[in-house]
Regions:
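Carboxylate-rich helix-loop segments that flank metal/cofactor sites and access channels
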Residues: 56-94, 98-107
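Preference for long, well-ordered alpha-helical segments
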Residues: 102-149
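Alpha-helical bundle segments that constitute or directly flank the non-heme di-iron/ferroxidase center
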Residues: 2-36, 93-116
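Short amphipathic alpha-helical surface patches that mediate protein-protein
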Residues: 32, 49, 77-80, 130
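Short, charged, low-complexity loops and linkers
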Residues: 1-11, 60-62, 85-91, 145
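Structural signal for well-ordered, non-membrane alpha-helices
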Residues: 21-28, 52-59, 107, 111, ...
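Alpha-helical scaffold segments that form or flank carboxylate-/histidine-based iron centers
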Residues: 8-16, 36-56, 92-96, 121-134
Length: 149
């Protein structure tokens, strides 16, 4: 039987998992908007792959502590739902800006989760997952600056 602390850890991990699922969905919906921009498409595919890898890593961590991984996406999945089929109509600059906002939200989610995790999982997040989130955020921030220029 899990303790209250374990439940808090599982809850925090599931929040991160939902955010990562949302990110993957969002990138899937955004990619059609950049079909004619190979370099930008490559950057978005790389960010999507990073989020997908984090989905798998967080799922494993949840299972290792005896939890049930979330299956539904979280808050920034709203982007994916909002642009379902319409990313091309938004234009690539709007898509990049929106993805950067999602990446920013992801940074906050990771920071907020840290105090609720046990020591081992805190290390996983701070040394592996959070740096990956910082990287995808940096990529999207740089692309947003280019889009704004």
């Amino acid at each position: 039987m899990r303790t209250e602390r374990d439940d808090s850890t599982v809850d925090a991990l599931n929040e991160l998992l939902r955010g990562e699922l949302s990110a993957v969905e969002s990138y899937d919906k955004a990619l059609p908007a950049v079909e004619d921009k190979p370099a930008l498409r490559s950057d978005l595919q790389e960010c999507r792959a990073s989020h997908e890898a984090r989905v798998e890593r967080i799922r494993r961590a949840i299972e290792q502590v005896g939890g049930e991984p979330a299956r539904a996406s979280g808050a920034w999945g709203l982007f994916a739902k909002a642009v379902a089929g319409g990313a091309r109509a938004l234009g690539w600059k709007t898509v990049v800006s929106t993805l950067e906002e999602g990446e920013d939200h992801g940074l906050k989610e990771y920071k907020d989760a840290l105090p609720r995790l046990d020591e081992g999982l805190r290390h996983l997040v701070s040394s592996e997952l959070y740096p990956q989130q910082q990287r995808t955020h940096s990529v999207m921030s740089a692309l947003k600056r280019v889009a704004s220029a």
